[in-house]
């Protein structure tokens, strides 16, 4: 099985969100399972120097973008047994603000159309004709259509299948209609028949949904949710129409990078057989953050983008009530000004209960996972979610709303059987969240029950191994 994995970002080269994590971890696991997988992405100027120094140029060619030809360099390197290729063009992938974000530029449609065309041209240059091209999110959504329109009759290309993973339906790549002629150079019929048209504009994600052989979302529940008007972002009708090729496969987490038994960022190592050592991380973090050192006070962790999607409206509404409870909250993240200001206020005025770090610090994130007793994720919607899986890996019990991947990964505590690996509530309601949290605190005070739940959480298999096997099975299905 040969798979060409096409992504706009991949850790450790360039990462803005979960796509970057998946693009590193999934191919690595696929390789372990015997798949000949190769990854291709843009060569951004922000790739760390120690990695840039390892890149080797293997080809130079021109790529046609609309009416013009553009230079394209092709470079390669190997990391963790996986071969990575990089599409080089400084006009598109060297930006002054790239350190802040690799996306969000006025010419993004042109940048990622160039990237898509370059990927298809690169296939013959590296003599790697895959069984499946696996594309991700809106940036590469046009690839199946361009493959069909320009390459379908070429030797080596005609039997290639495409799989399209939607990591977040909210970001669709919607651009002005002129993109069709000036950049994509595609026939008018694809706009007129609605295949890529979206309220008078061009929609890259819609193209991917229509023309890919298989559509994947990052959890089974999210695959169902996006077929409804509430979650469907105005593509729910199309997704219902294409439901026969839609499937949800949960993301995993990298168990090598996230292991409390050997994580270099945490204070004290522990595993499921030495859970009693976890509390040392809590006491150390309380001390560092200026919170009262007390193992009996439940410590609630939040590591997240501070945006409305993540349920911070609910938290903001209940903060006055939460401040009356015997608990501590540690927050790490950046995002919308209103939530940053809210957490800064409580950090200043309730410093014995709240510590807010309005930044992102990877080491501190790991320390919060290891130190916290509970991990709060009351998301409005959550395609998959990584935080709850990392929390379970480190023995911090997730408190989540039952949506998307949160519903698929967190089994709520059953007080009659003692089963479960976290706590959950159903409706997007602040008081439901609050009562769920209070229930978790009540169970926390019963150490025997709590330790059993922590053991359940740490034994939950959220590794990429399970997910990779599902992907391989799906690759085979579309190739048969």
From Swiss-Prot:
ADP-alpha-D-glucose binds at residue 15. Its EC number is 2.4.1.21. The keyword DNA damage does not apply. It catalyses: [(1->4)-alpha-D-glucosyl](n) + ADP-alpha-D-glucose = [(1->4)-alpha-D-glucosyl](n+1) + ADP + H(+). Keywords: Glycogen biosynthesis, Glycosyltransferase, Transferase. It is an enzyme of class 2 (transferase). This is Glycogen synthase.
